[in-house]
Amino acid sequence: MTNIALDLIGQSRLLFQHAAEAIGDTHEDALAFLRLEHEYHNALLVEQPNGNFADTVVRQYFYDAFNYLNYDALLKSEDEKLRAIAEKALKEVTYHRRWSSEWLIRLGDGTEESHAKAQTAVNLLWEYTGELFTPADFEQECIEKNISPNVAALRPAWLMHVSNILSQATLEMPSPDTWMQSGGKSGRHTEYLGYILADLQYMQRTYPEMQW
């Protein structure tokens, strides 16, 4: 899990650096550490708490399954740098998806307790998955310019992969048509993001522009 975290930090740095270059007059640390809560635009799924190990694995698997498809689609981006980032990241997220899916199968098809916890986590986190495939306003221009994929088009492949893994894990997949949470991509977050940002931003706000 530590290696996965390091991979995701590395991917984030590349994306923040690219965004800073496109915006101009800013840098990756400012984008990562100095924004206010409503200025972060992320899916609510990734700010859900770790909880127990089953919660962490299910959240990671749902995200990994999406991340793989997203980076694979970014290989066709009109943005040359995004294509390069995607090419590197795809190798990493392929491993991430394999790791989390194998652990989900172990938990679901394991003991009675691990199965129950895995099913509870699936049921709890499912309502946060729909937002992954709902384009936000800021994504529309990128979609129209073929900079990023239409995430809505990725959902059928995601559902197919998730259905297969949950079946192997002897877990029940909730209905794809159930009500879904949203708002994170528009800057409306759960209370959990505030705790994450308190840890994330502490050093940069206490010692601005500090260099290691």
Sequence positions of predicted segments:
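Domain-scale activation on soluble regions of proteins
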Residues: 18, 44, 72-74, 81, ...
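Amphipathic, non-membrane alpha-helical segments in soluble helical-bundle scaffolds
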Residues: 2-5, 50-61, 83, 115, ...
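Conserved alpha-helical segments that form or flank metal/cofactor-binding pockets of metalloenzymes
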Residues: 2-34, 100-105
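Inter-helical turn/loop segments and adjacent helix faces that build the functional surface
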Residues: 22, 71-88, 102-117, 135-144
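Internal, conserved structured core segments that host functional sites
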Residues: 45-99
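Acidic/His metal-coordination segments adjacent to aromatic residues that form catalytic metal sites
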Residues: 34-60, 107-114, 125-148
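Structural signal for well-ordered, non-membrane alpha-helices
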Residues: 9, 13-16, 72, 94, ...
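Extended, helix-rich structural scaffolds rather than catalytic motifs
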Residues: 116-212
